[in-house]
Amino acid sequence: MSEAKRRAAEKAIEYVENDMIIGVGTGSTVAYFIDALGHTPKRIKGAVSSSEQSTAHLKQHGIEVLELNHTGTLPLYVDGADECDPYKRLIKGGGASLTREKIIAEASKQFICIIDPNKQVATLGKFPLPIEVIPMARSLVARQIMARTDGQPVWREGVITDNGNVILDVHHLCITDPVKLEQELNQIPGVVCVGLFARRCADLVIIGSEPPHIL
């Protein structure tokens, strides 16, 4: 799948313009995009990064990393996904960077999602849904999730997000109404962010098939 990820990432470079400040996500597919950014003749002004991992990678290529508070609205955000349905709604957060990813997506005019073909699904939920949670609320949130859904929350032990929080991965969901579930789970006290990108879904999905396919 590495070649599929590379194809999707390199196709996304076509949407990058000189002097842009762009949002950059996190993950294995995004790593290919950052490498492509470092080698393209196009010269961006800088990037807003969704994780410490991506920040380090961008700096390795000499790309300036900027604070979102200082940039305002971004023209473009490029990120991967763990699942994508036919309506460009996503599950994200396998890399535990979902909160910053959702913030940057909201701050961007165009959100391009780059995936390999295996990430396409008819219905979201086979991949466990990540939820970022305030540490003291972990058990409370888990009980609330079980009361409100058919899912089984599992604490991702040993993982602390860049924001100092923990992750619950909710297994065995069949998400027929992603927007509604995203709203409902966001109401639970202690939830920082739900890894459903349904209300703010991707504007464009690049699938790294041969040749790349645009959804």
UniProtKB/Swiss-Prot annotation:
Highest taxon in the source lineage: Bacteria
Q: Could you tell me which Pfam families the record lists for this protein?
A: Rib_5-P_isom_A
Record text on subunit structure and interactions: Homodimer.
Q: Where does substrate bind?
A: T26, G27, S28, T29, D79, G80, A81, D82, K92, G93, G94, G95, K119
Its biological purpose is as follows:
Catalyzes the reversible conversion of ribose-5-phosphate to ribulose 5-phosphate.
Q: Could you say which protein family the record assigns here?
A: Belongs to the ribose 5-phosphate isomerase family.
Matching NCBIfam families, A to Z? PRK00702.1, rpiA
A molecular function (GO) held by this record is: ribose-5-phosphate isomerase activity
Active-site residue list: E101
A cellular component annotation (GO) from this entry: cytosol
* EC code: 5.3.1.6
- Part of which pathway? Carbohydrate degradation; pentose phosphate pathway; D-ribose 5-phosphate from D-ribulose 5-phosphate (non-oxidative stage): step 1/1
The uppermost taxa in this organism's lineage are:
Bacteria, Pseudomonadati, Pseudomonadota, Gammaproteobacteria, Lysobacterales
Locate the transmembrane regions by residue number. Answer: none
UniProt-listed Gene3D superfamilies: 3.30.70.260, 3.40.50.1360
* Stated name of the protein: Ribose-5-phosphate isomerase A
Catalysed reaction, written as an equation: aldehydo-D-ribose 5-phosphate = D-ribulose 5-phosphate
Q: Which InterPro entries match?
A: NagB/RpiA_transferase-like, Ribose5P_isomerase_typA_subgr, Ribose5P_isomerase_type_A
Enumerate the UniProt keywords alphabetically: Isomerase
Kindly list the biological process annotations in GO that this record carries: D-ribose metabolic process; pentose-phosphate shunt, non-oxidative branch
Instruction: Name the cystine pairs.
Output: none
